[in-house]
A protein has these predicted regions:
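Catalytic-core regions of core metabolic enzymes
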Residues: 1-193
């Protein structure tokens, strides 16, 4: 990383060097998202990188992730595969669905479904199938909640872990926050209600 120009990407990092490479990437002020596709990274390294990213206000996605794609903008990783699939999934323009998955195959399937039977996706994120992903569902749900173009989020989990339970708790708290705001908003036509 030290010798790479600011605009250069870096790939081909093996599991043993992933922790150090992740730390080096997070040091750079112009890098806000660190994405790692590598399988077989020790869990303690992944949890360290996740905590380190949080301290630095960065996003660490992975490891063992198929990638991230923002329609009409960029793709990190191999999500949706070959260029032909990107075009067939209409990823050249933004839709209104967010996608968060642990499964690479299911992320590709959900993107395809959203593009064929709806207006497509805003962003799709494969967080990786490992037991301890660098970023959990809740962090990405917060991101989508603050993205006005995203009207719905399709969250697809896998067996094991408590990520889905934490996402359900987040959603329940979100509903309560919405009810609290509605109670504080004055009623009547002069207030838009």
């Amino acid at each position: 990383m030290e010798d790479a120009p600011d605009s250069a990407g870096r790939d081909g990092i093996d599991a043993e060097r992933e922790k150090q490479s992740g730390i080096e990437a997070m040091i750079h002020t112009n890098i806000n998202v660190v994405y790692l596709i590598t399988d077989g990274v020790p869990e303690h390294d992944v949890t360290f990188l996740g905590r380190h990213a949080t301290k630095l206000w960065k996003v660490f996605n992975g490891s063992s992730s198929i990638g991230i794609v923002s329609a009409g903008s960029c793709r990190l990783g191999v999500i949706r595969g070959a260029f032909d699939n990107l075009v067939l999934s209409k990823l050249y323009r933004e839709g209104s669905f967010g996608v968060i998955t642990k499964s690479g195959g299911l992320s590709n399937e959900i993107i395809w479904i959203c593009s064929q039977f709806a207006d497509g996706i805003t962003t799709a994120i494969g967080i990786g199938g490992d037991a301890y992903p660098g970023t959990d569902y809740v962090s990405y749900l917060d991101m989508f909640e603050n993205a006005p173009q995203t009207k719905a989020v399709d969250l697809v989990g896998e067996m094991g872990g408590d990520l889905a339970e934490r996402a359900a708790e987040w959603y329940g708290a979100r509903e309560r926050r919405g009810a609290d705001r509605a109670e504080r908003t004055p009623a009547g036509p002069e207030h838009g209600r």
